Regions:
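Conserved lysine of the Walker
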Residues: 12-13
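Cytosolic-facing regulatory segments adjacent to core modules
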Residues: 18, 22-110, 124, 198, ...
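Helical hairpin unit composed of two closely spaced alpha helices linked by a short loop
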Residues: 103, 111-155
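Conserved H-loop
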Residues: 36-38, 151, 156-158
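C-terminal regions of RecA-like/P-loop NTPase motor modules
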Residues: 53, 88, 95-111, 140-149, ...
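The Walker A (P-loop) glycine that initiates the GxxxxGKT/S ATP-binding motif of P-loop NTPases
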Residues: 5-6
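Walker A (P-loop) phosphate-binding loop of P-loop NTPases
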Residues: 9
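Hydrophobic alpha-helical membrane-association signature
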Residues: 16-19, 98, 134-141
Length: 239
């Protein structure tokens, strides 16, 4: 299981949709996106903004200029041809129900990669006396599903407030919210950080755990209007 964690409004979903654009739309790998917080339409709009390089605000208002309209038309063709499937879990789904949806998508569509946005929003199959036990159950179930179905699960997760108490402190594995079991279940843990007050700018993806590799950090460029992360700062200009 591959885990991407950050504080709210840092860009977890934007990073996930950027990965979808590369894995599914670019490489045509069958992908399932389990959305527990935003509607399917909201995720689809973010993917459109990323692929077309048209801002979310412009897409919402619908006042596209001819150049933007052409980019949206082209992006729509690319997205429509991609093997991308959705599971809407906004109303609440247990880990068992999410597992059933993943297995169905694997059987029906040959899905190879699953995104879960986000882990702490998935419900446990039964109530526990402590929140940490509930999150631990969900994390363990997602790990088991990944292993049994032979799929790569990319789970998003929240960091707790400790990462923000000290100004300038980078996130740590111990900042994962609600359960240390998440850290133990994940094969790779990446912690995303940036200045949330900037709509564009540099970001860091800290590889805090990697079971079969080295840890370190990767520099990214955040394009807030397009809900996108690029790995090359020279791509920050609007085409």
């Amino acid at each position: 299981m591959f885990l991407v964690a950050a504080r709210p409004s840092i860009g977890k979903t934007a990073l996930a949709t950027s990965m979808v654009c590369s894995i599914c739309i670019g490489a045509k790998v069958p992908t399932l996106f389990v959305t527990c917080e935003m509607s399917e339409a909201s995720i689809a709009r973010r993917i459109m903004a990323s692929v077309a390089s048209v801002s979310m605000g412009t897409l919402k208002r619908g006042n596209l200029n001819p150049n933007e309209y052409q980019r949206v038309f082209s992006a729509n063709s690319k997205i429509g041809a991609a093997p991308l499937y959705y599971c809407n879990a906004v109303s609440g789904m247990t880990s068992a129900q999410v597992g059933a949806e993943i297995r169905r998508a694997v059987r029906k569509h040959g899905v190879k990669v699953v995104f879960v946005d986000y882990l702490q929003k998935v419900l446990p199959t039964k109530r526990h006396e402590k929140r940490t036990y509930e999150v631990a159950e969900v994390s363990s179930k997602l790990k088991a599903i990944a292993d049994s179905c032979g799929v790569s699960v990319v789970a998003l997760a929240q960091l707790n407030r400790e990462s923000e108490k000290e100004k300038g402190r980078t996130p740590r594995l111990s900042d994962l919210a609600d359960s240390g079991q998440i850290e133990r279940d994940a094969d790779t843990v990446c912690l995303l950080t940036r200045n949330r007050e900037e709509s564009r700018g540099e970001a860091q993806l800290l590889v805090a755990k990697q079971r079969d590799g080295e840890c370190g950090s990767v520099g990214l460029w955040y394009e807030g209007p397009f809900c996108r992360f690029d790995d090359n700062p020279e791509l920050k200009e609007v085409p």
